[in-house]
Amino acid sequence: MPKPEIHPTWFNETPIVCDGKPLCYIGSTKSELQVDIWLANHPFYTDSQTIIDSEGRVERFMKKYGINSTND
């Protein structure tokens, strides 16, 4: 018998969202999954030579955790 209250909540219909639009639905422990790049907008698959302009990893981390980037 599994222990009660140790397992995460399971969502059967979790949307994968890109640019504010749900792309598909999967089962997950998260209520919503955000992606920046998807098959439909990836430069390799769309034959475009544009550079994807997104925030760098450090900037996203600092923004996520509310860290001020000024040197005090």
From Swiss-Prot:
Where in or outside the cell? Plastid, Chloroplast
**Claim: Chloroplast is one of the keywords in the record:** yes
Query: In this entry, which stretches build a coiled coil?
Result: none
Instruction: Say yes or no: keyword Endoplasmic reticulum present.
Output: no
The entry's cellular-component GO terms read: chloroplast; ribonucleoprotein complex; ribosome
Cysteine pairs forming cystine bridges in this chain are none
Q: Which GO terms describe its molecular function?
A: rRNA binding; structural constituent of ribosome
- Domain of life according to the entry: Eukaryota
Q: Which PANTHER family match?
A: 50S RIBOSOMAL PROTEIN L31, CHLOROPLASTIC, LARGE RIBOSOMAL SUBUNIT PROTEIN BL31C
| Family to which the UniProt record says this protein belongs | Belongs to the bacterial ribosomal protein bL31 family. Type A subfamily.
Assembly = Part of the 50S ribosomal subunit.
Protein name per its UniProtKB record:
Large ribosomal subunit protein bL31c
Native organism? Trieres chinensis (Marine centric diatom)
